[in-house]
Amino acid sequence: MTALRRRLLAAAMLLSISLVRPVFAEDCVPLPSTVSPERLAALSRGFNADGWINGAPPSRALLQQLRKAGMSHVRLPVPAERVMPRFAATDERAATLRVLDSALKQLTSLGYSSSVDLHPGERFNRLHKDDPDAAMGEMQEAWRALAEVIRTHPADRIFAELLNEPDIEADRWQKEVETLAAFVRGLLPATTLIVGPVNWQRADSLPRFRPLADPDVVYAIHFYDPMVFTHQGHWDARDPLHDIMDLPYPINAGDPKVQALRQDLQARGAVKALAMLDTAIAAAKDKPGADRWLAPALAWQQQFSRPIIVNEFGVLKAGAPRQSRLRWLAEVTAYARAHCWGWAHWELAQGFGLVDAATGKPDPDVMRALLGAPGRLERSPAARGDR
């Protein structure tokens, strides 16, 4: 990509999220300039680097390839228990913060913006349900430590995501996140915050979430609908979705492949998986596409005029037909572009990853699907087959 083309693309993205309705976007909600257009532009195209903080980092060459392709944002899930005093010793917390600092330095040097995502596991989630005061204390201590790292980096390049997928009741989270946001704002006065609703941050959970008083906030949703498609071939053999394989997208009751899968599940007595499939077939009858599932978030944005990012979405590679996976990814990012939402694919190189395991490089078809470039995706499934 030439320097001129990079400048033109950046200018186009800044235009798309200004108060002037963009000529190329289908339905962008006009937003007040409470979050700078440059920061929203930085969130426009990204991926999750899950496993970097608590595992092996991606290679610099891979990060450079993705940056050159047009990715501008990396979401860094930080295992919450590794930076909370209740769950980790001082040495472990310090080591985790050093890894985070190194990651932010490298990403910034490559031209990325980064989100620091406080990403809890089962231990914190149990505490969060059982002891609200203790959980709030742990979140505050975690952010006190994370802020020490974040404030050494450019404020316009780092975002602070307060808590991934809060696993408590909506009313309680509303009160907690207002308190937590005020606390983090005191630590990071110039940093844009990212927050989301409960219930796995689903789009249909956002209407029950009130925007914060803090104006410098982006609102994050996660998208994996229909789950029977995106999580087919599930890694846990006890999960009913483990029994579903080769389900195409869109889901159509008249599709011979869908009918064959139903018959197979019936023959194997996979009752729960069959019920989940039938529910998905019924849901897709009238509106099978992403717009059906994402409409509640759009309605919320139209009401409150706040910026949105879909900072998790993806399809498990183990069971999904390849062309259907590409089609779903392309549909999600096309919807996001049409509404001037940012996005971050889940994830880089694991079960949902955009990296081709055989080459260790970005899968070119996945990149075309995500970035909306023309190519083989525009050919019909009938012409290519769906594997």
Describe the residue ranges of each PLM region:
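N-terminal secretory signal peptides that target proteins for export/translocation
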Residues: 1-3
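Boundary at the C-terminal end of the N-terminal hydrophobic targeting segment
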Residues: 23-25
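Active-site region of glycoside hydrolase catalytic domains
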Residues: 27, 33, 137-279, 283-284, ...
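Active-site mouth of glycoside hydrolases
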Residues: 27-192, 197-205, 216, 366, ...
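Catalytic domains of carbohydrate-active enzymes, especially glycoside hydrolases
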Residues: 59-79, 296-304, 333-335, 339-342
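Hydrophobic beta-strand scaffold residues
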Residues: 114-116, 308, 343
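Aromatic-rich peripheral "rim/lid" segments of glycoside hydrolase catalytic domains that contact
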Residues: 318-387
